[in-house]
């Protein structure tokens, strides 16, 4: 990816100044930053990153295979963060509601999720999400 390319998380920043540092083992400072970096990881098919940023207590047996299947089956086309509750640099928990647009088998769709995040040591981790609609 070229340095000037915008980040797929729709932050308005370039990928190298937005999600790439998190993908290269830097902890996201907030729950929203982690959620955006996970969206970008789905766009790029970064299965290991998505697995590693899922809270250890919430890693299902087939999680890596499920992530890989999702990455291959959907073309993500946009992210709209709708609401953020806590999840700041000094918080221990956070919630982010977002709409993620995608194309699957030539049809447009929107994934609406209310995600929960929790600190694990110094790192924000994805716990789970309530999918709407």
List each language-model region with its residue ranges.
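Short, low-complexity N-terminal intrinsically disordered segments enriched in polar/charged residues
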Residues: 1-37
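Beta-strand-connecting loop/turn residues
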Residues: 5, 92, 122-123
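Short helix-adjacent coil turns
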Residues: 38, 42-49
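Short solvent-exposed beta->alpha transition segments
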Residues: 52-81
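Surface-exposed, charged secondary-structure patches
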Residues: 70-107
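Short beta-strand edge/turn micro-motifs at domain boundaries
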Residues: 110-133
